[in-house]
Amino acid sequence: MMQRVVLHIDMDYFFAAIEERENPELREKAVVVCMLSGRSELSGSVSTCNYVAREFGIRSGMPCSRAKKLNPEAVFLPVRKDFYTSVSDRIMEILRSYADPGNGDSFEQISVDEAFLESSERTGGDFRLAFEVGMQIKKEIKEKENLTCSIGIGPNKLISKMASSAKKPDGITVVSPQDLEAFLWPLNVSKLWGIGSVTAGKLQEMGIVTVKDLAERDVIELISIFGKSRGTWLKQAASGIDDSPLKERDGSEQIGRIATLPEDSLDKKLISSLIERLAGDVIEKLDSRELSFRIVTVTVINSNFRMYTKSRTLSHPVSSKEVLLQVSGEILDEFLSENRTEFRRVGVRVGGLQKKKGQKSLFDY
């Protein structure tokens, strides 16, 4: 059986890098790309920033006003989503050309700036050839888009994803099956892809600090604490085992809008009005592409910049604004009953997309 080879490509500080490319004078400056709310000049949160900005402690997700305090001389720019997406589309086409041909999915875009691709057939399972493929990818992206990326190469998605972070920016890291333990086991367990802060905290309470500690624990003990599925996964992941396939499905795409309220509020009428506007924009986008949806997600960000998300899956695909508003309203009611901190931003997103096949009645949902 041929050795599996998976590459994970992660564009380096993508939005900020594009801005540097468009304006080379920014390269030596701290560049901060912000999702601005429109309330005031720097009301919003940091989408991404370059490495110069990170040296000042600026990070994605923090309020732009705080970033300004950390570095008053930084250059703050608004997100240009459509422009970034057009660049992303061209890069993804480059990456697709390096994925294995033949049957099955061999390419998986997981965000605007990162993707997996399978290169088992192209390389014959040889990780030395995979390194050459990775270098070719980096060279082509640099020549055509004047941008850099970091690449991880491993025997599965888990390892390649973690490897791409090892030498950022503009690095390439190969982890062959023989190198798994040397690469994985010294890492803090919180660095294992798929482990969040809650799980990491529980593991550390059990005395599990490194990935090696986790790999050496009895799977029965892990299952007794985390459940069969999660406990088994933890044991396998710590050993570098991951047989998950690459998947590129029509339904994996999502369309959404998010905006800032005129003022922090828990007023249902005010929030519902914004949701109606966002839903209208989403439906307009769906209609232009003749798509229906099956998953509705509402996101709220409160005045403390904590984000909460709830989703509903419908029995079958729809394309009705009326349905979107009804389901979004039900989710909003749940948020309002659970939260006492005022909302700052609200978002509406749909997933499970597919081409329209007709529309049933609202009462079917």
Curated annotation (Swiss-Prot):
EC number: 2.7.7.7
Domain annotation UmuC: ranges: 6-196
Catalytic activity: DNA(n) + a 2'-deoxyribonucleoside 5'-triphosphate = DNA(n+1) + diphosphate
Main localisation: cytoplasm
Gene3D superfamilies given in the database record: 3.30.70.270, 3.40.1170.60, 5' to 3' exonuclease, C-terminal subdomain, DNA polymerase, Y-family, little finger domain
InterPro entries linked: DNA/RNA_pol_sf, DNA_pol_Y-fam_lit_finger_sf, DNA_pol_Y-fam_little_finger, DNA_polymerase-Y, DNApol_IV, PolY_HhH_motif, Rev_trsase/Diguanyl_cyclase, UmuC
A Pfam match: IMS
Binding-site residues, Mg(2+): 10, 113
Cofactor note: Binds 2 magnesium ions per subunit.
Sites annotated Substrate discrimination: 15
Alphabetized SUPFAM superfamilies for the sequence: DNA/RNA polymerases (SSF56672), Lesion bypass DNA polymerase (Y-family), little finger domain (SSF100879)
Keyword annotations of the record: Cytoplasm, DNA damage, DNA repair, DNA replication, DNA-binding, DNA-directed DNA polymerase, Magnesium, Metal-binding, Mutator protein, Nucleotidyltransferase, Transferase
Localization per record: Cytoplasm
Function (record text): Poorly processive, error-prone DNA polymerase involved in untargeted mutagenesis. Copies undamaged DNA at stalled replication forks, which arise in vivo from mismatched or misaligned primer ends. These misaligned primers can be extended by PolIV. Exhibits no 3'-5' exonuclease (proofreading) activity. May be involved in translesional synthesis.
Family: Belongs to the DNA polymerase type-Y family.
Subunit structure: Monomer.
Protein name from the UniProt record: DNA polymerase IV 1
